[in-house]
Design a protein with these regions (language model features):
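Generic hydrophobic/aromatic pocket-lining and core-packing "Φ" positions
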Residues: 26-29, 94, 225, 366-370, ...
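Short beta-strands and strand-loop turn motifs
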Residues: 17, 107, 203-205, 425-428
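Nucleotide phosphate-binding/pyrophosphate-handling subdomain across enzymes
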Residues: 2-13, 19, 28-35, 121, ...
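N-terminal leader/targeting and accessory segments in enzymes
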Residues: 1-106, 110, 117, 277, ...
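Residue-level signal for inorganic ion chemistry
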Residues: 32, 81, 127, 182, ...
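Phosphate-binding loop of NTP-binding sites
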Residues: 7, 33-34, 72-76, 85-237, ...
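Short internal beta-strands
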Residues: 37-45, 238-242, 353-357, 376-386
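C-terminal helical cap/extension that packs against the catalytic core
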Residues: 52-64, 70, 367-423
Length: 428
């Protein structure tokens, strides 16, 4: 534990804005309560909606809760506000805190800020991108975990990994450790506000996403993403995928070194047997390998881990084969480009793919997606929602059936009815 960590938060009046239900807010609250902070927690969700999170905090006394709303008065008289990712850019409550000269922090960036302030020699590897960041994050973590098995060094996961909070890592990290952080654009807002970047930054891809939040302001979206490298120092590294490298700006201004990571079927290292499907995953592997090399990890360890890495749940994950029909789960593909990448990975099955998708819309464009989909599939099943309406409009006339459903049960019923031996049912 960092010695400063024991007393830094003690007695501070801290407002947590956004408890949530995925665990990160709960873990931040527990950590701060252990450090004797005076806590207020506010969330737009109601007590009923937050029941699972509140249950985990019920043994902690003296937390003030303001639920189902925010009160402007709570954003004054505090020593710090810790906001959750996704708080609106124009939040009047954050504006009130800033007006009252209250520091506004975020979990991941505050962790990095404090390790830097306390001159702890912890290497932070940050990964962002529209696609691939979770796979790259977990592959880097797996490589380092294997490499550090018999070492004093430890590796930890942080950032946007589900259920994990970064601040509690202050209890664990020590000199020489590495923290691997998946970072979305919202969390990188915090890095920009703190004017810090990871020691090693990985930028996988850049594609439109979260445009319902950014109100179609791609420059603002990119600006938040660019905080992954914008505040790097001499001696730091930026590792970029080829797609991201085309749009990266300011890359020569901060003294950090940078490299574009590439891999294709033609240049897979000799003797490597890779299990992950798809060209996009070869780029993900290349990014992770470059990071491992920059950290001095032996090639044998890298090769062993890459060959044993099977990917993550929901990322073109093979589920089962029944009656000759293969089922794949790619539900983390929430943009048209990500779904097309999955189809391209299964291109040997062109004309044999039953695609299940659609649903809610994030203010994205679907014209190219609709035309490309036609090249791969034999049937399309779409969950009702704004995205589905746009996809159906963009498709026009088709030679394959298009169905709109309101439940997974109905989607699978239709998919099975349209499938035969040798087909693929893909949820993406």
């Amino acid at each position: 534990m960092i010695m400063n960590c024991k007393d830094f938060f003690a007695g501070k009046k801290i407002l947590i804005m956004g408890l949530g239900i995925l665990g990160r807010g709960v873990n931040v609250a527990k950590f701060l309560a252990e450090r004797r902070a005076e806590l207020t927690i506010t969330d737009l969700k109601t007590e009923e909606q937050l029941a699972s999170s509140l249950k985990k905090l019920k043994k902690i006394p003296n937390i003030k809760y303001v639920l189902g709303r925010h009160d402007l008065a709570d954003f004054s008289g505090k020593d710090m506000v810790i906001k959750a990712a996704g708080v609106p850019l124009n939040s009047p409550y954050i504006a009130e805190a800033i007006k009252n000269k209250i520091p506004v922090e975020m979990d991941a960036s505050l962790f990095v800020k404090l390790t830097t302030t306390w001159t702890l020699n912890v290497q932070v590897v940050g990964i962002t991108g529209a696609r691939g960041k979770s796979t790259v994050t977990h592959l880097i973590y797996a490589i380092l975990e294997e490499a550090f098995k018999k070492a004093k060094q430890k590796v930890y996961l942080g950032g946007n990994v589900r259920g994990l909070a970064s601040l509690p890592l202050l209890k664990k990290v020590k000199d020489g450790d590495v923290v691997v952080m998946e970072l979305d654009s919202w969390q990188l807002q915090g890095f920009g506000e703190a004017k810090i970047s990871p020691n090693i930054a990985v930028f996988t891809t850049f594609l439109p996403d979260h445009q319902n939040y950014y109100k179609n302001d791609m420059e603002r979206y990119f600006s938040d993403k660019a905080n992954i490298y914008r505040w790097q120092k001499r001696g730091d590294w930026l590792i970029a995928g080829s797609g991201a490298a085309k749009v990266i700006k300011e890359k020569d201004k901060n003294g950090a070194k940078w490299k574009t990571a590439k891999m294709s079927k033609k240049n897979i290292p000799h003797g490597w047997k890779i299990k992950l499907l798809g060209g996009h995953n070869l780029i993900n592997i290349a990014l992770a390998v470059e990071v491992a090399r920059k950290l001095g990890i032996k090639e044998a360890v890298i090769k062993k881990t890459v060959e044993n890495f099977k990917g993550l749940p929901g990322r073109l994950e093979f589920i089962r084969e029944t009656k000759g029909v293969k089922y794949y789960n790619d539900t983390t593909a929430t943009t048209p480009e990500a779904a097309l990448a999955a189809l391209d990975s299964l291109k040997e099955y062109k004309g044999k793919i039953i695609l299940i998708g659609g649903g809610a819309d994030k203010n994205l464009e679907y014209k190219e997606y609709a035309q490309e989909v036609k090249k791969y599939i034999k049937a399309l099943i779409l969950f009702k929602g704004a995205a589905t309406d746009k996809i159906i409009s963009a498709l026009g006339k088709t030679k394959f059936p298009v169905e709109s459903v309101d439940s997974m049960e109905k989607a699978m019923e239709i998919a099975r009815a349209n499938s035969k031996k040798g087909d693929i049912i893909l949820l993406s």
